[in-house]
Amino acid sequence: MKKYLTLVNKENQIKNNYLKNLKLVDTKLADNTPCQLEEITYQNYLLLKKELASKKIDISLASTYRTVEDQQAIWEEYKEKYGLEYVKKYVAIPKTSEHHTGLAIDLALKVNGKYTWDNDELLQQEDIFKKIHKILPEYGFILRYPKGKEEITGYQYEAWHIRYVGKIPAKIMYENHWTLEEYITKFSGILYVNKEVGKTSFDIVNEISNIFGIQKVGHTGTLDPLAEGVLIVTLGKAVKVAELITAEDKEYIAGILLGVETDTLDITGNVIKSKPVDISKDLEQVVNSYKKTYMQEVPVFSAIKVNGKKLYEYARENKPVELPKKEVTIKEIKLLSSDNDTFVIKTKVTKGCYIRSLIRDIGRSLGTYATMTALTRTKQGKIDIKDTNTLEEIKQGKYKLHKIEEVLDLPVIEVNKTLEKKIKNGQKLLNTYHICLLYTSPSPRDSTSS
């Protein structure tokens, strides 16, 4: 999907590696001249053409993929015909044309029984083009050079020039009246994702990045492949506030098997210790006793660094290492159910708590071993699992992109223009607002992992 957001304009030349990976299909222009289009773009163009035909609007292709050499020839032709000032205004310099992407189309329109691609004639068909523009997002297209955006795009309004970007980005751009340039710089927000079992948090981030076609995507607390539930994903400028969201308390429901301990402290690992389960202590009482603050030993399979090396690297190399301990607080913990050698707990913990380690410690307090069999993050801060969307729902456009301010729920301080300028320039300010700044050193992205 990211390739569909490739920006090519007067300031951004087409990259050679993009051209190497371009998959084109053969087709024909309105005058039967052979041409090519990127394969997904062509498929969606055909669907658009079919939809418009049902509305008695007949479109065809006037211009599609162009090589750099093609664009050079066009530049020279129009320069000779109309002069240098004209081509500077209306014709792209070679390597800066959208047509190099294979994603751009200049439409021809059937008027009075014949196709026309003459710009002056097309400009007289504004009413028809308005109908075309309205349904473009349904097929992943945008009007690339809209009215009133000339200073941003660098080109005059072209009703006939459309560009494939993918359905979700196209819908967002249409609703916000954004150009591609504006989408790339302005699109940001926070998604509440319901992560499924089997995927890593990185898998989710990568898929979200592909869906929206943007590079800046992060998350606020790793969930292991075994785990599911609330994963908060930040996009664009929202990536900068990820650490603030990570600091919020998290709520989990965990399944536990007694009598077994694995190297990973969950059921996916190799069994390293086992013993018959013979619990003489009261299970609920022991579980409740963990509502406290204590020094928790982190799992060896984690991204915590010791001497500049991640713990899981020591584990994979089978090298001994002293496991660090960190202070964590179990704010709430409750036994939900139990059956012989298994039980389920619900707990609310502070940042940095490993549920796998908590389960190991409960097992030891019971005089046996324990390993995690399932984990669901049901809440992070005020964000509940019922407010999340699955990846499949997001792909279908069924999601809400939350604003940074509504997620952080921080107080608003109004400032005057002078102070606003100082803040934007990064100047030091007197703390006249009595703001308490809490600083915690950055921790690995999966420090809140299960």
Residue ranges and their predicted role:
Residues V233, A254, G308, L358, ...:
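Residue-level signal for inorganic ion chemistry
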Residues A73-K79, V230-V239, I245-E248:
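Glycine-rich loop at the start of a catalytic domain that most often binds anionic cofactors/ligands
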Residues F301-S302, V306-K331:
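Extended alpha-helical targeting/anchoring segments
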Residues Y139-G140, K291-K292, R364-T371:
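A common structural junction motif
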Residues M1-T64, V68-K186:
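Extracytoplasmic cell-surface/polysaccharide-interacting catalytic and binding patches
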